[in-house]
Amino acid sequence: GLVHDLSKYSWTEFSVGAKYYQGTRSPNDAERESKGYSSAWLHHKGRNKHHLEYWVDYSVDRNCVELVGMRMPEKYVVEMFCDRVAASKNYNGDKYTDSFPLEYYLRGRSRHHLHPESADLLEDMLTTLAEKGEDYTFDYIRREILHNK
């Protein structure tokens, strides 16, 4: 929506984007390589609910002291899906295919703290995109997930 990634216009994030921009990957990765962490990413993930890292917290199970993924509202999983597709198009340019976002997700899935239900929904959308294309997938999301909201 209109406020998607609005925090990127804050100085904390914008200055990193300007300094480390390469066009083929996130400037946050370059900052992380340079400084050992990404100040822009730490700022960004705490303000944008479509990032799975926003939903990481300590487990409600008192016997578990690990950080786990909390269940994300569906609208934010859909926004995360759209964000991943856009990033994949941006970083891959003319080489982009509708299978790229799923392939990227699957390569990094073991590192994610994503609630199982949120992961299932994201994987469903990414798989639908890879198998049936963008037009079908966005129609499917509107009809079946967002219920024409």
Which positions does each model-derived feature cover?
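Metal-dependent phosphohydrolase cores
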Residues: 1-149
